[in-house]
């Protein structure tokens, strides 16, 4: 048996990943040293780095397929560079076409986008070493050898730990759920300023991170479910994923305007108790995340029962003291929702809960991957238009790399291909991401050069520099996704050490700085002037997608209030789409903050609209969390009309404003005349409809304000 500390490190995926990188780099440095051909270290190491940057999670058969596709793309990219390099005009044409083609390949999904990036990277790595070997095929074969070496280690790791990446994704899901619940608990803080929207904005951004993690987990599950559904481990992970989705729906639910709660119960302990309970549930999700990583059974905290008992007692005291009955009923709905989350966590390890439902539709996952040649062509052809952000980015990157190549040809820079390498890493689809990377890239390069020159001076031995090369390579991958400036510093050190093997370490230091500055300048100019993808111009389209997804989510919930509760695939797709669109809107609004030409009025309107949309989705989520079959025809008819009205109010033309207002007044009048049964979910349905329609006038006003933005704002910076 492993000790708890040893088990923690044995099952720590980050350490396992770093160990794989370490072994791979040891191989690419030790083998050439053993052969006495240290020059071979450069293509082997660069090929290994490119392979590691394009590593994709999949089952064994999928990994082998990815490896074949990756090696094919790598060879085509590298061999094309070698063959066309002597003819600049042909090379420029090939660079343009291949860059556009590889980037458009990303239209098939993230898997192909990652492979395409690796192919472009291996092409530029080939440009850096065209003078190393006499024959055109030598460097491509060595680069591929480095890539194969890394993938062999990856396959061995997969055979030893086949479901580890899936467990990591599941653990991250519950970690993000914990953060979301903690932020949601702050909405019950009675001391928050009434007009402050910052907590809701933070909650919307956290929802975006959570949805990205859930989507990644779904992809990991899909790759393993094919032909593997009956295994106990698969049932367990699928069950954990469905529980995470259900908890997210309940956690994102809102049953009342929080400002109303603070106004009435600011001096009561009930808000603190709800806040503490949600915080405890966040801690439980965090504990569950750790249990998944360590492969330990989760033990539910027995203190939850006492917390629920105390909240029940607090609500009873408030009832005795004459608190408003409607608010107490709302708090009762909220408490029932939290009890359902508690029940999910308490029973997550039970064998009965992990048994897949007999209805196959309830344990299916939506497969968004391309199927067949016709589907592949359809997905690609959608991006053959300037309306596609991917098409614009493909054209932009083609021009960026060609312009960098032209500078090299005109100036005769010996190491100028680092300009292309910098532009490839820095130039992102939108201005905000590019500006952020640009600054970090420059800082990392300058610090790397400042550290690297003394290192080359004080460590002149070949063996010492090979050891440092391995260390800097491992540190690059360790910081790649958390500290981009640190990662750039370490990759700069790695490059200096590689070229010092040829005796050019000091010679390439200054060109590396100059090329980085030129590459960053080209990338900045490209995202600012070549079809600039300003996020504020995407706001009307993102808002439309969010409102349409919310309407589909409402329709799916309405169907279940008529037919009864289940977790069929269509319902889960509608729910996921609504939260995904909300996350996209949050990303757009966040990226707008640093863009030029966005007026304070538009920025404020977008911020308010994001908060309203997230609140709107949370009101719908409450309807979904409590969904069950209703039998009262009057309530069902009211719900039908309310859902139709919401769709109409979100999509009507300005000329129909008067008709929409009349429909709203009629709906409010009907709502006041309803008599829902207190012992059913009917009061909650009426309450949530009231909350939804109360938001619609302000959402409509901001929609009209935002829709006018593209016509009033200049295109370029």
From Swiss-Prot:
Compartments, as annotated in UniProt: Cell inner membrane
Cytoplasmic side of membrane: 32, 88, 134-142, 420-441, 487-489, 534-717
Keywords: Cell inner membrane, Cell membrane, Membrane, Transmembrane, Transmembrane helix
InterPro entries, sorted: Integral_membrane_YccS, Integral_membrane_YCCS_YHJK, Memb_transporter_dom, YccS_N
Major localization listed first in the record, in broad terms: membrane
Coiled coil: none
Residue spans, topological domain Periplasmic: 1-10, 54-66, 110-112, 164-398, 463-465, 511-512
Membrane spanning stretches: 11-31, 33-53, 67-87, 89-109, 113-133, 143-163, 399-419, 442-462, 466-486, 490-510, 513-533
Membrane association type: Multi-pass membrane protein
GO cellular component entries: plasma membrane
Domain of life: Bacteria
Gene: yccS
Tagged with keyword Isomerase: no
Name recorded for this polypeptide: Inner membrane protein YccS
NCBIfam families from the UniProt entry: YCCS, YCCS_YHFK
Family assignment from sequence similarity: Belongs to the YccS/YhfK family.
